[in-house]
UniProtKB/Swiss-Prot annotation:
Subunit of the oligosaccharyl transferase (OST) complex that catalyzes the initial transfer of a defined glycan (Glc(3)Man(9)GlcNAc(2) in eukaryotes) from the lipid carrier dolichol-pyrophosphate to an asparagine residue within an Asn-X-Ser/Thr consensus motif in nascent polypeptide chains, the first step in protein N-glycosylation. N-glycosylation occurs cotranslationally and the complex associates with the Sec61 complex at the channel-forming translocon complex that mediates protein translocation across the endoplasmic reticulum (ER). All subunits are required for a maximal enzyme activity. Residues 30-40 are cytoplasmic. It is found in: Endoplasmic reticulum membrane. It holds the Pfam family Ost4. This is Dolichyl-diphosphooligosaccharide--protein glycosyltransferase subunit 4. Pathway: Protein modification; protein glycosylation.
Amino acid sequence: MITDTQLTLLSNTLGATIFLLIVYYHYVATKTVTAAKKDN
């Protein structure tokens, strides 16, 4: 079975990864919108 320590490490790693992906997504989406406005 999975121990409490392993579960804690897994959940913290997944949470941090998802958080960073969301921040990266917002950065890319904002940069794309800004670039599209400059082209017009």
